Amino acid sequence: MELHRVGNAVPLDRQAGLTTAQWHEDLTFFATQLTSLHPDAFANTPKAKFDAAVAELDGKLDHLNPDEIYVGLDRIANLIGDGHTYVDFPPDSANLPLDIMRFGADSRIDMVAPGYERALGTRIVAIQDTPLASARELAATATPVAETTGLRDRRIDAHLTIGMMLHGLGVTPSRDSARYLLADDDGKQFTMDFKALAPGERTKWIHAASPLPLAEQPLDGSAACTYLRPANTLYCNVRTILQLEKPSQQMLELIHLEHPAKVVIDLRQNGGGDYNLGLQYLVRPLAEDKSINRKGHLFILIGPDSFSAAMSNAAQFRTMTRATLVGEPIGERPNTYQEPREFTIPNSRLVVRYSTRFYRFATGPENIIAPDKQVVPSWTDYKAGRDDALEWILEQK
């Protein structure tokens, strides 16, 4: 999984060179700007508690390193509560060459860079001297307080692969590497040191899943459709709600050409974009197609990583079509603040994102988009390259 947060902050050496007075100035600016720009900053955390958190960080600034200060700022931003409000990771955040996925109570390494293959598929037991459960509790303090457990868990998974975050949380002695205690499926434990990638460095990921499921295969562009002839099903993987005009045209042409019995729109790895584009190029065209917009013929795959515009479009598929939602509950709450903007903290140049507008995409007592058919992936099936949710759809008659 590629973390959703990127920023334009200055290199760490610039931040490391700041005086304590400059950090105090930055904290004051940050807290003032954030609470004045967000339309409802204290909806989920009382002002007194928010102010106390700011005062606590201010009292510690003289004794913290830049990574610890970053984590302190991000913790405060996450008290606002919505998934679009946080402090960006700067480009030099020291990403470690592994990816983590949660299967039940286990945190598994599902991807690594070359040279770390032995770690593929193992369970994480500890990071440095911190047991995994404790590391997850620490990382949870830098996740939005009002979002679902699913979204917070996915952000925790990501935090535990970022050197800057691990160092700032006090889990590792430096940001440049982390030692993981791992256990294979036979229970044998061993340690492996992961060294941080250079800023902007790309790597060729090696996957634990073999073969790689269709949903995780590389895409050239924002979306792509594949006609699965044996199942007479058109599968469209939509990774971002941007630049959808051509993929939508391809989708409609394949529907006209192949007359599929089912159409599947996969939003499970979609971090958002512009929900108006999803409405224009996905929701409305399929709603207007009488051959597809029928119960048992249109399916939307969702999960905790379906974020922002993807969440909005999933909600619209539910209300505007006869689609069946399949997978896991969406991480972001449907009735929440979105439309993020950003500001830059003057001295550290850290970038802060904040929501500007409240949206309501669901009715009823539960502020969550749950699937009509819940299918939770198991480690055994995932490792074997099976996509349980998609397979359930293909089996429907």
Language model features by range: what are they?
Residues 1-13, 17-31, 185-188, 200, ...:
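C-terminal "post-core" interaction segments
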Residues 1-263, 271:
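Flexible, low-complexity junctional segments that flank or bridge functional domains
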